Protein backbone atom coordinates (compact mmCIF):
# COMPACT_ATOMS: atom_id res chain seq x y z
CA UNK A 1 0.00 0.00 0.00
CA UNK A 2 1.02 3.61 -0.50
CA UNK A 3 2.30 5.54 2.48
CA UNK A 4 0.21 8.64 3.22
CA UNK A 5 1.37 11.81 4.93
CA UNK A 6 -1.24 14.27 6.12
CA UNK A 7 0.50 17.63 6.21
CA UNK A 8 0.47 21.38 5.80
CA UNK A 9 3.45 22.81 3.94
CA UNK A 10 3.59 25.90 6.17
CA UNK A 11 3.90 23.68 9.26
CA UNK A 12 7.50 23.22 10.48
CA UNK A 13 6.85 19.73 11.93
CA UNK A 14 5.28 18.62 8.64
CA UNK A 15 8.25 19.99 6.73
CA UNK A 16 10.58 18.05 9.01
CA UNK A 17 8.89 14.78 8.08
CA UNK A 18 8.93 15.68 4.40
CA UNK A 19 12.68 16.30 4.68
CA UNK A 20 13.15 12.88 6.29
CA UNK A 21 11.15 11.23 3.50
CA UNK A 22 13.27 13.07 0.94
CA UNK A 23 16.52 12.12 2.67
CA UNK A 24 15.50 8.45 2.74
CA UNK A 25 14.25 8.55 -0.87
CA UNK A 26 11.04 6.77 0.09
CA UNK A 27 8.99 6.28 -3.11
CA UNK A 28 5.26 6.42 -3.69
CA UNK A 29 4.27 8.67 -0.81
CA UNK A 30 0.82 10.24 -1.08
CA UNK A 31 0.62 13.73 0.38
CA UNK A 32 -2.73 15.03 1.64
CA UNK A 33 -3.03 18.67 2.64
CA UNK A 34 -4.86 19.46 5.86
CA UNK A 35 -6.07 23.05 6.04
CA UNK A 36 -5.79 24.07 9.69
CA UNK A 37 -7.19 27.54 8.99
CA UNK A 38 -10.41 25.95 7.74
CA UNK A 39 -10.52 23.41 10.57
CA UNK A 40 -9.96 20.32 8.42
CA UNK A 41 -7.94 18.78 11.26
CA UNK A 42 -11.05 18.84 13.46
CA UNK A 43 -13.16 16.72 11.13
CA UNK A 44 -14.53 13.43 12.41
CA UNK A 45 -12.54 11.54 9.79
CA UNK A 46 -9.25 13.12 10.83
CA UNK A 47 -9.75 12.97 14.61
CA UNK A 48 -10.55 9.27 14.36
CA UNK A 49 -7.06 8.79 12.97
CA UNK A 50 -5.39 11.34 15.24
CA UNK A 51 -7.30 12.31 18.40
CA UNK A 52 -4.71 15.05 18.98
CA UNK A 53 -5.79 16.55 15.61
CA UNK A 54 -2.29 17.68 14.66
CA UNK A 55 -0.16 17.52 11.55
CA UNK A 56 1.87 15.73 10.43
CA UNK A 57 0.10 12.38 10.59
CA UNK A 58 1.61 9.34 8.88
CA UNK A 59 -0.37 6.34 7.69
CA UNK A 60 1.78 3.40 6.67
CA UNK A 61 -0.50 0.54 5.64
CA UNK A 62 -2.76 0.26 8.71
CA UNK A 63 -0.26 1.88 11.09
CA UNK A 64 -0.91 5.44 12.24
CA UNK A 65 1.60 7.68 14.01
CA UNK A 66 1.72 11.41 14.66
CA UNK A 67 4.29 13.83 16.11
CA UNK A 68 7.11 14.68 13.73
CA UNK A 69 9.82 13.33 16.03
CA UNK A 70 8.11 9.96 16.44
CA UNK A 71 7.49 9.78 12.69
CA UNK A 72 11.12 10.63 11.90
CA UNK A 73 12.46 7.86 14.11
CA UNK A 74 9.97 5.37 12.72
CA UNK A 75 10.81 6.17 9.10
CA UNK A 76 14.56 5.86 9.57
CA UNK A 77 14.21 2.66 11.59
CA UNK A 78 11.98 1.05 8.96
CA UNK A 79 13.21 2.50 5.68
CA UNK A 80 16.75 3.73 6.24
CA UNK A 81 19.54 1.96 4.35
CA UNK A 82 21.68 2.56 7.44
CA UNK A 83 21.37 4.26 10.80
CA UNK A 84 23.25 7.45 9.95
CA UNK A 85 20.17 9.68 10.31
CA UNK A 86 19.13 8.06 13.60
CA UNK A 87 22.04 6.12 15.14
CA UNK A 88 21.52 2.81 16.92
CA UNK A 89 24.58 3.32 19.11
CA UNK A 90 23.07 4.07 22.55
CA UNK A 91 25.24 7.10 23.31
CA UNK A 92 24.87 8.66 19.87
CA UNK A 93 21.13 8.04 19.86
CA UNK A 94 20.78 9.57 23.32
CA UNK A 95 22.29 12.82 22.05
CA UNK A 96 20.02 12.81 19.00
CA UNK A 97 17.02 12.10 21.22
CA UNK A 98 17.98 14.93 23.56
CA UNK A 99 18.05 17.35 20.63
CA UNK A 100 14.69 16.05 19.43
CA UNK A 101 13.23 16.65 22.88
CA UNK A 102 14.86 20.09 22.83
CA UNK A 103 12.91 20.82 19.67
CA UNK A 104 9.63 19.46 21.01
CA UNK A 105 10.05 20.96 24.48
CA UNK A 106 11.80 24.30 23.86
CA UNK A 107 12.01 25.34 20.22
CA UNK A 108 8.60 24.41 18.87
CA UNK A 109 6.64 25.69 21.90
CA UNK A 110 8.43 29.04 21.51
CA UNK A 111 7.61 29.03 17.81
CA UNK A 112 4.00 28.00 18.28
CA UNK A 113 3.52 30.44 21.14
CA UNK A 114 4.70 33.24 18.89
CA UNK A 115 2.73 32.35 15.77
CA UNK A 116 -0.54 30.91 17.07
CA UNK A 117 -1.95 34.19 18.50
CA UNK A 118 -1.16 35.96 15.22
CA UNK A 119 -2.41 33.31 12.81
CA UNK A 120 -5.47 32.07 14.70
CA UNK A 121 -6.44 34.63 17.35
CA UNK A 122 -6.23 37.92 15.47
CA UNK A 123 -3.30 39.44 17.33
CA UNK A 124 -1.20 41.77 15.18
CA UNK A 125 2.16 41.62 16.97
CA UNK A 126 4.30 38.96 18.61
CA UNK A 127 4.07 38.75 22.37
CA UNK A 128 7.28 39.97 24.08
CA UNK A 129 7.42 36.95 26.39
CA UNK A 130 7.31 34.65 23.36
CA UNK A 131 10.16 36.52 21.68
CA UNK A 132 12.21 35.99 24.83
CA UNK A 133 11.54 32.25 24.65
CA UNK A 134 12.74 32.22 21.03
CA UNK A 135 15.97 33.93 22.08
CA UNK A 136 16.41 31.45 24.93
CA UNK A 137 16.10 28.64 22.39
CA UNK A 138 18.83 30.27 20.33
CA UNK A 139 21.00 30.53 23.45
CA UNK A 140 20.71 26.80 24.12
CA UNK A 141 21.26 25.81 20.49
CA UNK A 142 24.42 27.93 20.30
CA UNK A 143 25.82 26.04 23.29
CA UNK A 144 24.84 22.65 21.86
CA UNK A 145 26.70 23.28 18.60
CA UNK A 146 30.15 22.09 19.57
CA UNK A 147 30.42 20.04 16.36
CA UNK A 148 29.43 20.44 12.73
CA UNK A 149 25.87 19.27 13.26
CA UNK A 150 23.35 19.46 16.06
CA UNK A 151 24.20 16.07 17.56
CA UNK A 152 27.80 15.55 16.44
CA UNK A 153 29.72 15.23 13.21
CA UNK A 154 26.92 13.45 11.35
CA UNK A 155 23.78 15.04 9.92
CA UNK A 156 20.80 13.42 11.67
CA UNK A 157 17.09 13.77 12.25
CA UNK A 158 18.05 16.15 15.06
CA UNK A 159 19.21 18.66 12.46
CA UNK A 160 16.14 18.09 10.33
CA UNK A 161 13.64 18.65 13.13
CA UNK A 162 15.53 21.54 14.71
CA UNK A 163 16.11 23.37 11.43
CA UNK A 164 12.44 23.21 10.53
CA UNK A 165 11.72 25.17 13.70
CA UNK A 166 14.77 27.42 13.78
CA UNK A 167 14.56 28.47 10.12
CA UNK A 168 10.98 29.58 10.70
CA UNK A 169 11.90 31.44 13.88
CA UNK A 170 14.79 33.14 12.08
CA UNK A 171 12.83 34.14 8.99
CA UNK A 172 9.63 35.24 10.71
CA UNK A 173 10.04 35.96 14.42
CA UNK A 174 13.59 36.83 15.57
CA UNK A 175 16.43 36.98 13.01
CA UNK A 176 19.56 35.19 14.20
CA UNK A 177 22.37 37.67 14.86
CA UNK A 178 25.54 36.03 13.54
CA UNK A 179 27.66 38.01 16.01
CA UNK A 180 25.63 36.81 18.98
CA UNK A 181 25.10 33.30 17.63
CA UNK A 182 28.00 32.52 15.26
CA UNK A 183 27.73 28.73 15.57
CA UNK A 184 23.98 28.70 15.15
CA UNK A 185 24.18 31.06 12.18
CA UNK A 186 26.82 28.88 10.49
CA UNK A 187 24.82 25.71 11.18
CA UNK A 188 21.68 27.23 9.68
CA UNK A 189 23.64 28.23 6.59
CA UNK A 190 24.98 24.66 6.22
CA UNK A 191 21.48 23.26 6.53
CA UNK A 192 20.11 25.72 3.98
CA UNK A 193 22.53 24.42 1.35
CA UNK A 194 21.26 20.84 1.58
CA UNK A 195 18.95 19.52 -1.13
CA UNK A 196 16.43 18.24 1.42
CA UNK A 197 16.17 21.75 2.86
CA UNK A 198 15.85 23.45 -0.51
CA UNK A 199 13.20 21.00 -1.73
CA UNK A 200 11.11 20.36 1.36
CA UNK A 201 11.71 23.15 3.87
CA UNK A 202 12.32 26.41 2.03
CA UNK A 203 9.07 26.50 0.00
CA UNK A 204 6.86 25.86 3.02
CA UNK A 205 8.82 28.32 5.10
CA UNK A 206 8.07 30.98 2.50
CA UNK A 207 4.37 30.12 2.67
CA UNK A 208 4.43 30.49 6.44
CA UNK A 209 6.26 33.80 6.14
CA UNK A 210 3.66 35.16 3.72
CA UNK A 211 0.80 33.98 5.91
CA UNK A 212 2.19 35.64 9.03
CA UNK A 213 3.05 38.84 7.15
CA UNK A 214 -0.59 39.11 6.06
CA UNK A 215 -1.69 38.96 9.70
CA UNK A 216 0.79 41.39 11.28
CA UNK A 217 -0.01 45.07 11.46
Swiss-Prot record:
CDD domains: GST_C_Delta_Epsilon, GST_N_Delta_Epsilon
Superkingdom: Eukaryota
Enzyme Commission number(s): 2.5.1.18
Record bears the keyword Transferase: yes
Single GO MF annotation: glutathione transferase activity
Domain GST C-terminal: 89-211
GO biological process terms, semicolon-separated: glutathione metabolic process
Enzyme superclass (EC): transferase
A Pfam family this chain is assigned to: GST_C
Binding site for glutathione: 11, 53-55, 67-69
Catalytic activity of the protein: RX + glutathione = an S-substituted glutathione + a halide anion + H(+)
Residue stretches making up the GST N-terminal domain: 1-83
Record InterPro entries: Glutathione-S-Trfase_C-like, Glutathione-S-Trfase_C_sf, Glutathione_S-Trfase, Glutathione_S-Trfase_N, GST_C, Thioredoxin-like_sf
Keywords linked to the UniProt accession: Transferase
Protein purpose: Conjugation of reduced glutathione to a wide number of exogenous and endogenous hydrophobic electrophiles.
Family: Belongs to the GST superfamily. Theta family.
Binding partners and assembly: Homodimer.
Protein name in UniProt: Glutathione S-transferase 1
